[in-house]
């Protein structure tokens, strides 16, 4: 694109739509006035406007009787995820059977997993084709739950995400997210009105480091969940996600404490 930097800091591989087709009950830090039931025509407008850059569309299947039809209509054009949903086990299983293949920040903005009501989490466990996002900032999920999820569902399905918002890397204070005021205190971001978690203020490198040091997941597993697994989700593993001949030379070098030492971008050394 015009104005491209000589050393761009990152490649934009796609956009993830976590709305507007979500549940008002599980809206998290989203403005309820923007929420609508899943709608094929609206989704197609987003895809057209983004020129194909939208790669994931999240839906709350319990909020619309047309959810299965929506998935069947859209699944060949975009990946469908379950996001900010109040669905029960059967509703989630029907969505996954129809072609939904991704779970947005598992455990957050969905019903809790219990022995009589397994909900979305139980449906994800029973649907081996579904990839699983985890926010491993040591705020959103307890370390024991992270370990249990890896054991129950398998590391090959885990995708580490930051879920970070605009205040990431900024001092404590008040910021905005989608028009809503957010209070940032340390590594926690919450809505000023109501106190709900409002995304995170961490980054993916810190999440990977936390997975290893706090949650006790092996380093090689954590790295794959931050690199190879997301690349496979996006369908770009032939270019990204591992250090292999013929792939992009995008590499981060860490020391023995997992602190960043160097970034290599496109085979160049823009950041030392």
Where do the protein language model's features map onto the residues?
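Short, electropositive alpha-helical surface patch
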Residues: 1-6, 69-79, 218-219, 223
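Divalent-metal coordination cores built from histidine and acidic residues
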Residues: 1-53
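Electropositive phosphate-/nucleotide-binding environments in soluble metabolic enzymes
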Residues: 36-40, 64, 68, 89, ...
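Active-site core of metal-dependent hydrolases
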Residues: 48-172
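His/Asp/Glu-enriched, well-ordered alpha-helical/loop segment
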Residues: 122-134, 138, 150-162, 167-254
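Short, Lys/Arg- and Gly-enriched loop/turn segments at beta-strand edges
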Residues: 258-264
């Amino acid at each position: 694109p015009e104005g491209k930097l000589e050393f761009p800091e990152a490649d934009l591989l796609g956009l993830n739509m976590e709305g507007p087709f979500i549940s008002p009950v599980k809206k998290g830090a989203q403005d309820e006035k923007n929420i609508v039931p899943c709608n094929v025509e609206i989704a197609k407008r987003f895809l057209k406007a983004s020129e194909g850059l939208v790669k994931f569309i999240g839906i709350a299947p319990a909020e619309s009787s047309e959810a299965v039809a929506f998935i069947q209509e859209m699944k060949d054009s975009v990946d469908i995820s379950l996001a900010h949903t109040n669905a029960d086990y059967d509703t989630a299983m029907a969505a996954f059977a129809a072609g939904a293949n991704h779970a947005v920040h598992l455990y957050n903005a969905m019903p809790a997993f219990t022995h009589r009501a397994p909900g979305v989490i139980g449906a994800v466990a029973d649907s081996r084709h579904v990839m699983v996002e985890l926010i491993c900032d040591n705020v959103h999920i307890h370390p024991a739950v992270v370990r249990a999820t890896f054991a129950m569902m398998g590391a090959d399905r885990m995708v580490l995400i930051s879920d970070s918002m605009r205040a990431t890397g900024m001092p404590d204070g008040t910021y905005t997210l989608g028009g809503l005021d957010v209070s940032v205190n340390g590594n926690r971001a919450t809505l000023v009105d109501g106190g709900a978690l409002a995304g995170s203020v961490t980054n993916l490198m810190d999440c990977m480091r936390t997975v290893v040091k706090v949650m006790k997941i092996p380093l090689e597993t954590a790295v794959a969940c931050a690199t190879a697994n997301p690349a496979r989700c996006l369908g770009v593993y032939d270019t990204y996600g591992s250090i292999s001949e013929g792939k992009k030379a995008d590499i981060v070098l860490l020391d023995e404490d997992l602190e960043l030492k160097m970034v290599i971008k496109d085979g160049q050394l823009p950041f030392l």
